[in-house]
């Protein structure tokens, strides 16, 4: 749709070059096989936090710790704020599993001293060249929400303007 393309162009114009994907793997006779790649709302963060303990309990003591994604995500989001404004964690309020992921990210951001807000995408409002939620200015937008669900949203122009101008980072 036009709105989806406009959102993608706004992120590109705002110099957003980051992406987070989840690849689901199944173990079979011939090793691991990918069964799904989730690029729009890749969850599993909460579940992954338990993998090191489960692996160690099963006797696997070497290997790569997959839980580094939360640390790296939080570091990147905090650096994008450049010391001002909040990080808005936008999620689909109808899905408890989406809230679960965003609440985990919020908790980890707050533990590091960042201001992180949980909100639906419709809560974003224009504030000058940027965005706000309530009275809180937003400097970073983490969208854990399918782009196509934003189609026709009343505040879409405000989001597009803020992101494409670089006033709000994604």
Give short role names for the model-derived ranges.
Residues 1-7:
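Low-complexity, highly charged intrinsically disordered N-terminal segments
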